[in-house]
From Swiss-Prot:
It is found in: Nucleus. Residues 12-36 are annotated as: Disordered. The modification Phosphoserine is found at residue 29. This is Nuclear prelamin A recognition factor.
Amino acid sequence: MKCEHCTRKECSKKSKTDDQENVSVDVPSPAQENEEKGEFHKLADAKIFLSDCLACDSCVTVEEGVQLSQQSAKDFFHVLNLNKRCDTSKHKVLVVSVCPQSLPYFAAKFNLSVTDASRRLCGFLKSLGVHYVFDTTIAADFSILESQKEFVRRYHQHSEEQRELPMLTSACPGWVRYAERVLGRPIIPYLCTAKSPQQVMGSLVKDYFARQQSLAPEKIFHIVVAPCYDKKLEALREGLSPTLNGARGTDCVLTSGEIAQIMEQSDLSVKDIAVDTLFGDVKEMAVRRHDGVSSDGHLAHVFRHAAKELFGEHVEEITYRALRNKDFHEVTLEKNGEVLLRFAAAYGFRNIQNMIMKLKKGKFPYHFVEVLACPRGCLNGRGQAQTEDGHTDRALLQQMEGIYSGIPVWPPESSTHVQELYQEWLEGTESPKVQEVLHTSYQSLEPCTDSLDIKW
């Protein structure tokens, strides 16, 4: 695991018994489950070490450990096999949503362009029996747009008596879990209430897409491919949504590495296929991303929007200044020598700790902070950027960063599909349904006594 104090895998500040050090969830291969050799009999058992999770501070309960064991290839193949063997009335529609930060991993892994990697991944998943493959960028569009509106509102309402700032992003599940389980009430009010891209995608698939296909939400099995293991915990946090007939938005999360392992050990002949969209027979013709070094781009897009809405300033190029280290950057909007906006990016628990200490002391001068648990951002997720011994594969990470930077940037405001969905799905940009579907709340949760890990 990574220590919040030094970001190293092993740290003397955390002591464990031998049993706790080796706590893991076994993921049997499909061949074990079926007790027969099939086309995936080569897939080795995968182990998800709970101690590797960045959000490990007494937060993984025994019940959650059991649920995490279902966030696995075993659960995915179980549904695939049921679709092959059961009566059609019991079939599930399998939908896979791929995070944009996962695509550079597949491009680097298989020496392909991002577009070709996207098509190869889509073709492979459909050859397994998946019905639809989506890109989560459209969900990030909603998350960013709602974050932009929330920041402007907070800025206007902020005062010494009613402290609304800094607004801290909430798209990183490791950081959110740490805030809820460890930091609690002093910090939670600063968390942005806009849902993460994964949560929004769950609603898009199980609500909008389900109605378009005349399907009940529970008839869809939704898998997310993501760069980090914390996304599995995020799927559990989403809970059972009343708007989705009591179903979860995301049923299963598989990391990029888990999918790559399945691909490498499969004998299937794969044909490249364009990624689907939520809009009928229309296909994704090009891969796009938001403006961020390794993230979903909340900092850059909220900064530009705030500069325009609050001060009438149009910002083209954003200059990031590294301060304490390469994972803490500052962005400012200045006019006539006065700093109008001061934003920051804080990646890794070392910078998060420094941020929290200064925030509690009232010596944190920022209006907005993009917070990510992983040093160097989402591309460095432990589900795709680590070696077998648990260290970061620096060469692979550098290659992925180069690939990611080459993907065209599209601002969320430019998506006509998003504007259509606001009207068709959410009844307008300021409707009560927007608040219900695209926003969430946070709770201060005491560390659980039945956890599979221990406190620092």
